Amino acid sequence: MARHIVQAIQSHAFATPYKCALSDSRGDLGYADLDSFSTRFAMRLQDLGCRPGDRVVMLASRRALLVAAIIGVFKAGCVHVPLDPRMPADRLRYILHDVAPTLVIADEDLIDAIEHALPVAAPIVPVTELERLLDDADSPRLDALVQPLPLPPLDERAIAYCIYTSGSTGRPKGVLINHRSIADFFEGTRAVYDVTAQSRCASFSPLNFDVYLMDMLFPLAQGASLYVHDDVNAPDLLFDAIRVHDVTHFSAWGMMLGLIAQAEEFEAAPLPHLKTILTGTDVPDVKTVQRWLRKNAGVQVINAYGPTEATCAATAHVIREIEPERRTLYPIGKPLEHVRALLVDEGGNRITAPGVPGELMIGGTQVMQGYWNLPEETAARLVRLDGVPFYRTGDVCAYLADGSLYYMGRKDNEVKIGGYRIHLSEIQRVINSVPHVYGSEVVLLESRYGETLLAAGVLLERGAPLDADCKADEIRQRLAAELPAYMVPRHVKVLDQFPQLSSGKTDRKALLSILQQRINESNQEEVNS
């Protein structure tokens, strides 16, 4: 099995040249065409001045052609830097100044904003130029090259991508992952995610989110066919994409998995080809997972866990049984093949006993090379244990009796109210167990009197029988029955949806503002009445 993603695609192009590699609403691309286009695009990058190690920014909406362009970036030896095309102007300006790209690939309607944000002039390749390059193998720009440069040799040590995540300082930071980490991640993933050359996969992930590795590139490395869904996350459209394209494998973070299950045809329309669902990013709701397991016999759900700094996913737990009486969250499982996982207490001492919470440390070859231009931050988050660099995740976990890891929440998601330490995820677990609830978030608010209190936002399944106020009362009653009084949120608000970051995670800052506004409106109504 080829280690480098480029080698894998070249191998499939030779063995199955006409097999569909990529498709979307615009058409499809076979493996030979994928290999040919990505080579031509790599040469085009060289023509525009890109050299190995240079950063190539991608600011564009999700589509199959851009997945092919990523392979071209890798062939040129460049660093893929995917950014959210919807990001605020200030954030875009900061990242472009930080990463100093040699070239930018962008949707045409973003070009003016990019030109104003770039610190120094750099070529901007519109997506329409990629379309022309795909349609015309004898591109005149390529003919104009007197002596095309040879493509650089593939190097596992070279940086493959730089993905920007939210930083603890409030500034985004670029996570650097090399090709060896990707190759080892793919090796470990094969043991749990059963994608083969016969699989038909669907991708719903944003291009600027590291899940694209498992969502898009992993299926291509296996020789599978990949359908790339348009940038529209409506439940009915997502469900139809799975049904119409006879999808066997797809991935969706926990909240999106619940969203797709709200499709009008979800219960009635069968999905006979579906085999495996990969979820993660946020904690999957038990009831939502059970609904998917019931879709047809043999479906399995993989609950994967891993920060961007550990190459997408570091642990995985396979769920096959419905377990109708289950009340606890699903484990995040055991480390992948090239990953080491340790739990440590506040003093840095290792924890081995089941049930004892500690911070999760991740080591092995999947760990990042560091943060771009942030040596001090890199040194603070990468610590050496047994001579091996380990990443401090900031996540609190505990061992189960079988050695699996159970996720308990973020260290910074542990709050203190009235002297009591509270893990917000425990409150969410109880809320999500209430019938017709498929998602919840708990936040800390400050009242007008300076009092610290808990508030919960809740998402209900389509067709929930009770109105919002009655359901909120039912949730409060369940919380009061299962949790001590200090863990029961003062306010429970049913919302239509949660604001999302480009990664698909809930935007907790925006949610906090929404809940605060809803609570203020309710208080005003009480005063007026």
Q: Where in this protein do the model-derived segments appear?
A:
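ATP phosphate-binding P-loop of adenylate-forming
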Residues: 38, 157-175, 186-193, 502
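Conserved AMP-binding
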Residues: 60-63, 84, 195, 205-209, ...
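AMP-binding/adenylate-forming domain of the ANL superfamily
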Residues: 1-161, 184, 285, 289, ...
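Gly/Ser/Thr-rich phosphate-binding loop
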Residues: 221-224, 247-251, 261-327, 331, ...
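AMP-dependent adenylate-forming
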Residues: 4-6, 104-152, 182, 300-303, ...
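Conserved pre-ATP/AMP-binding loop-to-beta segment of ANL
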Residues: 146-164, 171, 195-201, 207
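ATP-dependent adenylate-forming carboxylate-activation enzymes
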Residues: 2, 60-63, 78-97, 108-111, ...
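Conserved AMP-binding/adenylation subdomain of ANL enzymes
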Residues: 173-200, 209-248
